[in-house]
Amino acid sequence: MKNFTPFVVMLVSLEFISLSQSFATLVGDTTKIWVGTWTTAPQLVEPGNMPPSPGLTNNSLRQVLEVSIGGDTLRVRFSNEFSTSTVTMNSVQIAVSTGGSTIDTSTNRELKFNGNSQVTMSAGTAVTSDPIAFNLTPRMDVAITIYYGQTSSSVTGHPGSRTTSYIIAGNTTTTTDFTGAVTTDHWYNISAIDVLAPSTTACVAILGNSIADGRGSTTNGQNRWPDIFSEALLRDSSTQHIGVLNQGIGGNCVLFGGLGPTGVSRYDRDIVNQNGVRWAIIFEGVNDIGGVSSSTAATNTANNLINAYKQFITKAHAKNIRIYGATITPFKGNGYYNQYSELCRNTVNQWIRTAGNYDGCIDFDKIMRNPLDTASLVTTYQNDGLHPDTAGYRKMGSSIDLNLFTALDTTTLGVHSVRIIDSYVLGQNYPNPFNPATTISFSVPTQSFVSLKIYDALGRVVSILVSKLLSAGTYSRQWDAKGLASGVYFYRLLAGSFIETKKLVLLR
């Protein structure tokens, strides 16, 4: 028997290797998470921005948008949040846009919803498509074409698209171009695109108003300041894995009034609950300040804005998101300006700049103000006294310090420095090989339902180490393999949209 032992051991080893490879393929031996590459903030569409005739019911709508980061798998979210009745999408296609209403038909893919082509969104709800393989490259223009069934008289959308959409009668979702279509510079129902990306990938979410939304930028030019910021991130090797989510709404207020849901009411939806957000930029408040007309109102509005910002900070830190405040830019020459609104603006900006409040400051006021009249925008950067022109947007987007978005281990929360867990991490077990016990460590960046299971080489569960809701933190679990045979095993961490599998070896 001695002469046969090495051969038997070799066969067993090869068998384990083969089974290991098969199981690794089955459960996914890669670390991927869902990360936002594009968003637009849904709102109730005002009467003047409704879809033009022939309307959406039983017709096709082609909408073009530019993503930030790329990926090979995506999913799309659609919103009917502000409509009062159901909206049916009979068919939805996504393709590479080649300019105007034209698409590359070889890239056209149908989106499905729980395996179905048709989906009906109830009033007040949103839906997300099934994941599909799609070769999405950074800053790619894509076209989403929807063939509608019944639609609502109240429409959910985003009026400030700065991008042309196309409406044509009937079902033309697979048509190369929409020749003869009615055009409109608004988006309807589309809300977000996520990509499946390595766990090191992340995104920045921006809460803003019309200056973030790009009023005064070029229609179809993709030259809002968040677009310029995205370009800068993608050019730098240390930040090219970071997406940008522009959640600006024109006319939006932080506190009350204005257009769309207020910043306070939409903050969770648009910022902390977006997929893959590691940083947030708050650049909103000018529409609240613009209504100030007395010293008392200046004091009250400044205090209320600061209290809202504090809420934003608390919520961001609870999700381990670094949050940066952007100072309010000048607006002398616009109807918003008076001595009291200027006092309010300066009070708010002083708080934003003060260390220990936000995790950092992006000082747009400093770079955009006229040195000869600091209440005004630089003459060559302004559009109407309030909104920058394209040169101003380029200045804003290119001025942001990219070091704010490199991987750091700590951030300052008030006066305390705390360890920040940036991403899901599954460590290699130790010791490995082991007999009979080993320890597995893992980290979760935000409160998540966590599953940590051990599998044998055939994919059968042999132990469940964790199956419950855990707060953000780093954890370790010991696995005692007493009574199990020597060989290769696998452990898999499932938390939120994160999945990772690793191998461990029991050697007796």
Each model region followed by its residue ranges:
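Bacterial N-terminal signal peptides
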Residues: 8-18
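N-terminal secretory targeting modules
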Residues: 22-207, 217-220, 238
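Oxyanion-hole/transition-state-stabilizing segment in secreted/luminal serine hydrolases
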Residues: 38, 213, 217, 249-304
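Alpha-helical scaffolding within the catalytic cores
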Residues: 60, 188, 226-233, 259-275, ...
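Structural recognition of the beta-strand scaffold that forms the well-ordered cores
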Residues: 75, 203-208, 212, 242-248, ...
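Glycine- and acidic-residue-enriched helix-capping/strand-helix junction motifs
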Residues: 214-227
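Catalytic His-Asp segment of secreted/periplasmic serine-dependent ester chemistry enzymes
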Residues: 290, 328-416
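C-terminal outer-membrane/trafficking sorting elements
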Residues: 418-430, 434-508
